[in-house]
């Protein structure tokens, strides 16, 4: 069976695989969009958030490939400044190596129809140090923006058997994060993992809540930085 893609479209499938859902994060710490101006949401025209994303320049959003696979992009818009501004999508693409079963290469780009004057964040090109602290910014069940503190776990360690995953599951385009708060759970796919003020990961999948020995699995952004750079130029 396919892994969990923390996505509301797949809640029925996800219930069979994991207890992470897109109902919203639990256990996060309240934050503000001014602290994370680069965080955006992919949402329906009714305002319902389906995925997170992050601005890497004034018109380009990085998000998870699953978000463009499981939703009709023509029916999505991008919420900027925590939804205060809604921008149409001009074009989009996802990594051609994205695999529905393994969740390998779970990364995509969205080009906005107009530039936005908010903060952006740099894409990390070097692997984060194992054990470094990071933060996931996402929304809780009440639609409040929250931070979830994470301890970053590298690819080889996460798949070593010390946690819930085998080396066959944690592939080279993935890294993991263990929630610092034992009660933290859930996040929208595509929500950014930031460490050292750079984008190092995107929420992708997991078998648990990212805690109690069950790390959340993220798209490993440094391993896909070249694809992001080249694709953003041609999008």
List the model feature ranges, each with a label.
Residues 195, 201-235:
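Extracellular collagen-like Gly-X-Y triple-helix signature, i.e., selective recognition
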């Amino acid at each position: 069976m396919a892994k969990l893609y923390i996505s509301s479209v797949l809640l029925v499938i996800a219930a069979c695989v994991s207890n992470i859902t897109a109902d919203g994060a639990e256990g996060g710490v309240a934050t503000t969009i001014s602290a994370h101006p680069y965080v955006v949401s992919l949402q329906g025209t009714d305002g319902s958030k389906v995925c997170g994303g992050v601005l890497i320049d004034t018109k380009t959003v990085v998000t998870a490939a699953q978000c463009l696979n499981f939703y009709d992009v023509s029916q999505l818009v991008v919420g900027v400044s925590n939804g205060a501004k809604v921008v149409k999508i001009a074009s989009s693409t996802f990594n051609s190596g994205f695999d529905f079963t393994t969740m390998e290469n779970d990364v995509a780009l969205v080009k906005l129809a107009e530039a936005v004057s908010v903060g952006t964040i740099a894409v990390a090109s070097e692997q984060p140090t194992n054990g470094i602290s990071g933060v996931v910014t996402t929304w809780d069940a009440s639609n409040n923006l929250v931070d979830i503190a994470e301890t970053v776990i590298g690819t080889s360690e996460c798949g070593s058997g010390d946690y819930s995953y085998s080396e066959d599951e944690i592939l080279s385009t993935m890294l993991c994060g263990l929630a610092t708060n034992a009660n933290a759970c859930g996040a929208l796919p595509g929500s950014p993992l930031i460490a050292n003020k750079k984008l190092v990961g995107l929420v992708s999948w997991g078998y648990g809540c990212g805690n109690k020995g069950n790390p959340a699995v993220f798209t490993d952004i440094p391993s896909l930085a070249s694809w992001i750079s080249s694709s953003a130029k041609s999008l």
